[in-house]
Regions:
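Core nucleic-acid recognition elements
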Residues: 11, 34-174, 189-196
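Alpha-helix capping and helix-loop boundary segments enriched in small/acidic/polar residues
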Residues: 11-15, 164-167, 189, 208-216, ...
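A glycine-rich phosphate-binding loop feature that marks nucleotide/adenosyl-phosphate handling sites
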Residues: 42-43, 61-64, 77-85, 197, ...
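Terminal amphipathic helices with adjacent charged low-complexity linkers/tails
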Residues: 75-116, 150, 337-341, 358, ...
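Catalytic alpha/beta core of large soluble enzyme barrels
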Residues: 121-151, 437-438, 531, 535-536, ...
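Function-dense linear segments that define catalytic or interfacial modules
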Residues: 158, 171-191, 195-221, 225-268, ...
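Internal maturation/activation junctions in enzymes
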Residues: 208, 215, 524-546, 550, ...
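Polar, glycine-rich mid-to-C-terminal structural blocks
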Residues: 316-317, 325, 329-397, 401-404, ...
Length: 794
């Protein structure tokens, strides 16, 4: 009896077994350890009259996915190809493509995308689309493993209003390249250049750029960093700012250190202030209420310095016990730690807590200046203070870190001491993922007196104003009952002067593909050019954010795939060979990144605040690294391929296009997309499961073989002191920071070990550590938890 199947478009046709055989043959062709017959037999497809063609495709994909295992990892590519065949078909139906052709002409893709309201109408302006269409290489789709193509489909491919995909991977990459190259003089060749590095997975842009470049909503930045002043206007203006940034998908880092503490003075009334926690509770609710386009709740890290009198409550924010009104479970607390605090911990001496209302300048200083002011305030009997053993507070911090994974730790003095733009500002906090370190400044508020005759006068809050009757008042005490120079005051308001909110524009080099001197020299200039273009093409939710980004022209080029690269080269994690290899790679990336930005400065101009920067003085990131870091790498004094003195002179002469250059983000999503290991981290396990809308997907580390097996050491089996040392070697070469996670097995955990890890991080010049991930040695849960990760930096 003839069996009829129902196609996706509703049409019925006779079942043709040869089509299924042809598809399974194509899916398995050239892949070791898999076979066409095994796929077809194990699928157990029961052919029933009237069945849907989609059911056949789904059965084959499901079979291939379930067969992914340590000894047969190539089934992931079989599943990816089967998924791609289905995707080609679905996009063809949605866009009315030509039957039998996976990729329609670039012109047709763009026309359909614009008509659907998904592509920006100017995307093709000035391009030869026939030439670019011929340049697209559909065979690069075969680079995807199954989880990679599923991630691309779920998170990045443009869909129509019915949630049907209307673009294919190479169309997406070309459209992104065209968008980023649109202002280049030779945009045609630059679009090809950009397309090559991203479609070959040599460099990958961060999630917001991948998602939004080419669309009408081209918000391309990953994270934002801001600060709130200690007044009600500034705090609530900050809420509005956070809401708008979260609305457009940005992760947020926010400094709260200027907010007066619980029991502080308000308007000369003692014990009137509610402290930071009530305001952080509102921030917590804001993160939930203003989600990221309905996909996930907002993500906000909140920063405080350990001398703030609210520090104990702050450390307890995510604690599962205690008064719920004092908890903020959806925020990510982080500490902004001075060298002085760490020294007091090491000395086992006392630590003093202050109300920032009484010690305003502690937030504005670092290093020796901070230390001198702090000690002076300790000795000032007129200032309200509290004391506790520094080691007791440190123990509380580490206990919370171990129990709930936070607060993250960031080192204030190291961040500011190495700040290339310390001449024009101060670093007050990091971002959500603790890899971005840039100047920020809270909004400033002046007193505006509007008189009944319509005239206006403005004053600083502390300015003295003589009102009629001869009484002298501070400007912030003048009211509508007063007159000045015979003019009756109509209303007193505060006028906002925008501060600086920093922006992170990110991309990552895939070390599993780019790890030689020649390849680094080839791809880094392209990556820097793309990121620099992001600054000018970005949609900014707020004027002040755009102004800050144009002033510093900040970017963050990082890396991913370090663990895969080490396994390829058969280098053990934490070995001297690992340290030497990563030192060589990071030096090459640092040198070429700085050179590329300087080359761009010659072509397009320097960033506005270049003069006076460390760059302008020829000071490079590695010049500021602790001497102890150099001792970690076994190399001769003159063992370098690069002439840094020549580069110093070039930078002093030609300038820099970008004020901040390098930062290593977590890269969770984009490393999955390109099929490599996450950022700089050792692997979680050799095999684990990723949770997806489709269920649990087995994942095997890339290129696993008998030769690489021993070099994929699971993260929880590695001495975490070696993780810190590797991070210190990378940090030597980068001007910003890196997201460094620590992995702690419960059978190895102790207060002493945690203390050793984090004090070593401080001593070796790390600017931050991110999550502390703990695991029971007998844990059977092989599912990777990504619920706490920032979407933007990935």
């Amino acid at each position: 009896m003839a069996i009829m199947i129902q196609k996706r478009n509703g049409r019925k046709e006779l079942l043709d077994i040869t089509k299924i055989q042809k598809m399974s043959m194509e899916a398995t062709k050239g892949l070791e350890g898999v076979s066409q017959s095994e796929l077809e037999l194990d699928a157990h497809i029961k052919f029933i009259d009237g069945m849907h063609s989609k059911d056949i495709q789904d059965a084959l994909i499901k079979t291939a996915v379930e067969k992914i295992d340590i000894d047969v990892p190539n089934w992931t590519f079989v599943a990816a190809r089967l998924f791609l065949f289905d995707l080609y078909h679905r996009v063809g139906i949605a866009t009315h493509g030509v039957k039998g052709e996976a990729y329609c002409h670039l012109k047709d893709y763009i026309k359909f995308g614009i008509e659907a309201g998904r592509l920006i109408p100017s995307i093709a302006d000035g391009y030869d689309l026939d030439e670019l269409n011929a340049y697209i290489d559909p065979s690069r789709d075969l680079l995807f493993n199954y989880l990679g193509i599923k991630t691309l489909y779920d998170r990045y491919l443009i869909k129509n209003r019915k949630a049907e995909p209307i673009e294919l991977p190479q169309q997406m990459f070309m459209a992104i390249a065209m968008f980023l190259a649109q202002n280049e003089k030779d945009k045609q060749s630059k679009a090809k250049e950009f397309y090559d590095v991203i479609s070959k997975f040599e460099v990958m842009l961060a999630t917001p750029t991948l998602s939004n470049a080419r669309t009408n909503r081209h918000q391309l930045s990953s994270c934002y960093i801001g600060s709130s002043p200690d007044n009600i206007e500034g705090i609530f203006d900050g809420y509005k700012e956070m809401a708008l940034l979260s609305k457009y998908g940005g992760g947020i880092g926010w400094d709260w250190n200027q907010i007066r503490s619980l029991g502080g003075v308000i308007d000369d009334h003692k014990s009137a202030a509610g402290g930071t926690v009530p305001f952080l509770k509102i921030t917590n609710d804001l993160a939930i209420a203003v989600d990221q386009l309905g996909t996930r709740k907002g993500a906000i890290a909140v920063y405080l310095e350990p001398w703030h009198m609210d520090i104990v409550d702050f450390v307890d924010l995510k604690k599962n016990s205690g008064e719920e009104r004092r908890r903020a479970h959806d925020l990510f607390p982080a500490l902004w730690i001075s060298d002085l605090f760490m020294e007091r911990v090491m000395e086992d001496s006392y630590w003093t807590l202050f109300d920032p209302y009484e010690v305003r300048d502690l937030s504005e200083t670092f290093g020796d200046e901070f230390k001198a002011k702090y000690i002076a305030y300790e000795n000032d009997e007129s200032i309200t203070k509290d004391r506790m053993k520094a080691k007791d507070l440190w123990k509380k911090i580490l206990t919370s870190y171990f129990e709930v994974g936070s607060p993250f730790l960031c080192w204030k003095d190291t961040a500011n001491r190495t700040n290339p733009n310390s001449h024009v500002g101060h670093i007050r906090s990091s971002n959500l993922c603790t890899e971005i370190f840039q100047n920020t400044n809270p909004n400033h508020y002046k007193i505006k007196l509007e008189f009944e005759d319509g005239t206006v006068s403005t004053y600083e809050e502390s300015d003295l104003v003589v009102v009629d009757g001869g009484v002298t008042k501070k400007a912030n005490k003048v009211s509508a009952l007063d007159s000045v120079n015979g003019k009756r005051v109509f209303i007193v308001e505060k006028e906002k002067i925008d501060g600086d909110t920093a922006v992170c524009n990110l991309a990552s080099i895939n070390l599993s593909k780019i790890n030689t001197k020649e390849d680094i020299e080839r791809v880094v200039p392209t990556a820097i050019r793309m990121l620099d273009n992001v600054i000018d093409l970005n949609f900014y939710p707020l004027r002040k954010v755009k102004a800050t980004n144009l002033k510093s022209r900040s970017i963050g080029l990082g890396v991913m795939g370090e663990a895969e690269m080490l396994a390829q080269h058969q280098l053990a994690w934490g070995s001297s060979e690992h340290f030497k290899k990563i030192d060589q790679i990071m030096e090459a990336i640092s040198y070429n990144t700085i050179k590329s930005s300087s080359d761009l400065a010659s072509e397009k101009g320097v960033y506005p605040t270049f003069e006076g920067s460390k760059w302008s003085k020829g000071i490079m990131p590695h010049d500021l690294a602790p001497q102890a870091v150099n001792a970690l790498v076994d190399k001769d004094l003159f063992d370098t391929s690069y002439d840094w003195d020549v580069l110093r002179e070039k930078v002093k002469k030609d300038g820099m296009r970008n004020g901040y250059l390098m930062a290593i983000a977590p890269t969770s999503s984009i490393s999955i997309l390109v099929g490599t290991t996450q950022a700089i981290e050792p692997v979680y396990k050799r095999k684990w499961f990723e949770e997806n809308l489709s269920g649990l997907i087995p994942v095997v580390v890339p290129r696993l073989s008998p030769e690489t097996w021993a070099y994929y050491t699971p993260a929880f089996e590695i001495d975490q002191l070696q993780v810190i040392k590797a991070a210190a070697i990378r940090q030597k070469w980068i001007d910003q920071g890196q997201s460094t996670n620590i992995f702690m097995s419960l059978d190895k955990a102790s207060g002493k070990y945690l203390h050793e890890i984090y004090t070593l991080a401080w001593k070796l010049g790390l600017k931050s550590t991110y999550y502390l991930r703990s695991q029971s040695p007998e844990a059977k849960n092989d599912v990777e938890d990504r619920s706490m990760e920032c979407a933007g930096c990935q």
